[in-house]
Amino acid sequence: MIISKDRKLVVGLEIGTTKVVTLVGEVLIDDNIKIIGFGTCLSKGIDKGKINNLDLIVSCIQESINKAEIMADCQITSVYLSLSNKYINCQNEIGIIPISDDEVTKEDIEHVIHIAQSVQILNEHHILHVIPQEYSIDQQYGIKNPIGLSGVRMQVKVHLITCHQNMARNIIKAVEKCDVKVDQVIFSGLASSKAVLTEDECNLGVCMIDIGGGTIDFTIYIDGSIKYSQVIPYAGNIVTSDISYAFSTSRDNAENIKIKYGSVKKPPLGSSKNIDFSDINCNFQQNLQQDALIDVIESRYVELLSLVQDQIVHLQKKLHKKGEKYELLSGIVLTGGGSNISCLTDCAEKVFQKKVRVAKPFNISGLIEKITEPCYSTVIGLLHYGKESYINIDKKKKEHSFFEIIFKRINNWFKKEF
């Protein structure tokens, strides 16, 4: 977050396997976000969220931040930082307390959430997010906001997201070496969900899948609450490796081939064409049947999506045993750079047997022609988190000023009367 004299600015920083992106947004009077600064560079020194060369990744972060500062004409002092790696873990927990007075107060909610998160988590992990799913008061279930309601006992169900302490610490260290403070570390899957999912989709049930370069993040929402989240440590880069191996070419060439000619659906029988790769690498075989390339890409995408489908089925069985509702009426929402592959919707619908859409981030304005592609969903979601912090600060200021006004009126009344 950056507080300037006349602007409310928020900065998102995504340090991914393939790219580092810095985005500067201005929170407008109507609480919309206007993009005013953008900086990116290719990632070096990091793979699947794990830093393997601190100096290299610090250099990338600094370059990305510098570009965004120049475009936005501001100095970046703090950022909202995304995090995704195989050491992310999630668990659902319950907290129960007696209601202190006749009705639920803000303090009761803080207390019951504290109880819910005071559980054993994985060794060397710390909690990133505690997300309330629903509250129950006595025999009243499915309550979203219990403040002011009466009862004897309150229960909360929460979704905990944890990460390995050292993994998070090293990413933060890299950012701080650029003289920038981290306002909050946010799981990438949550950030992407914030950027691409609608409220209706979350209420009806939806699975958001962000296919990045090194990892796949996915989240499942039912009845407006997050029920499950996970990171799969394979994504777009493994497809690139498959192409490189299958056709004996470098990873850079394989990536270019994937972007330029890649698809997960073969053309109609008899219409497969020869692809001339001589412009990419003179040592590479000059012609290749399009079908051969698609075979490699499609088989890997089916495998990756099937890993998510297995987890969806597992959660479905788990909730069914508990007698809890499980429906994904809104289907599957794909995003991330890996979702740009041609015909992915058709391929995914076969795997999930549900409706599928590829989502771009929404609810932003400004320099949107640069950053409305699926590959920027995470960093845009970070801005939405920053916006919410501003909104909360404004609410507290209003509450404080309200009590100040009341106090002054009472004080003035006493002066007049006595």
UniProtKB/Swiss-Prot annotation:
Q: What is its main location?
A: membrane
Which keywords accompany this UniProt record?
Cell cycle, Cell division, Cell inner membrane, Cell membrane, Membrane
Q: Which GO terms describe its biological process?
A: FtsZ-dependent cytokinesis
Tell me the membrane topology, using the record's own terms: Peripheral membrane protein
- Where does the UniProt annotation locate this protein? Cell inner membrane
| InterPro entries referenced in this protein's UniProt entry, alphabetically | ATPase_NBD (IPR043129), Cell_div_FtsA (IPR020823), FtsA/MreB (IPR050696), SHS2_FtsA (IPR003494)
A Pfam family matched in the record: FtsA
Please give the GO cellular component terms listed in this UniProt entry: cell division site; cytoplasmic side of plasma membrane
Q: How does it assemble?
A: Self-interacts. Interacts with FtsZ.
What's the stated role of this polypeptide? Cell division protein that is involved in the assembly of the Z ring. May serve as a membrane anchor for the Z ring.
Q: Name the family.
A: Belongs to the FtsA/MreB family.
Which PANTHER family is this protein grouped with?
CELL DIVISION PROTEIN FTSA (PTHR32432:SF4), CELL DIVISION PROTEIN FTSA-RELATED (PTHR32432)
This protein is called what?
Cell division protein FtsA
Q: Which organism is it from?
A: Buchnera aphidicola subsp. Acyrthosiphon pisum (strain APS)
Instruction: Please name the taxonomic classification of the source.
Output: Bacteria, Pseudomonadati, Pseudomonadota, Gammaproteobacteria, Enterobacterales
Q: Which gene does this sequence derive from?
A: ftsA
